[in-house]
Amino acid sequence: MKLLPELMRFVQFTSTKYNIDESHAVGHSMKVLFNAHQIYSNTVHLHPYLKSQEPVIYTAAIVHDMCDKKYMNQADGIKEINKILTNKLGYTEIMFINKIVSTMSYSTVKKSGFPMLGKYQLAYHIVREADLLSAYDFDRSLIYHMYNTKQGFENAYVNANELFENRVLRHHADNLFITEYSKKRGYELYYDALSQMNTWKYIINSYDKSTSIEL
């Protein structure tokens, strides 16, 4: 079996096994892979050596949440990732995929900074930024909070709004983007997110006149 469909099946299986909700499951893996491709395609002409790292970038983008501490023990998740990659990619490629997916989360970066990955440093940033770009989808944040707070849609909106104000809308201010493509695309998605947030606020307040969200 070709690696891409096998990895997508792996994401499906792992998401079911660990009750990973749709905000971090197959749809998210597909979006991060798409974003990684866009960043890579707009960066490789400046750094041709990235061509040889394309499998690492794309694979890490697909499986990055299959060791997420929110859903499982990270070490166990990485072991499962390695099982699927053994005999498909080389030892060095698998090693750097492990390093990328275990150090790219927002919380890890804020706590420990960027890791030093040598010649794979830019590959790391491409995958990390691909995930950051996907975070601008306010609907996805709503879905995550609906599944994980279990407090209803309005509270999910409040929690998602707080997350965006304190984290997502600060990506540029916090200097989390390295590549020029992500800096530009991030600004576009920033304004899309603001529009999305305001639209949901209007829908919630107008759908049921007995409720009103004060922000």
Model regions: which residues?
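Hydrophobic, well-structured mid-protein blocks that either form specific transmembrane helices
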Residues: 81-117
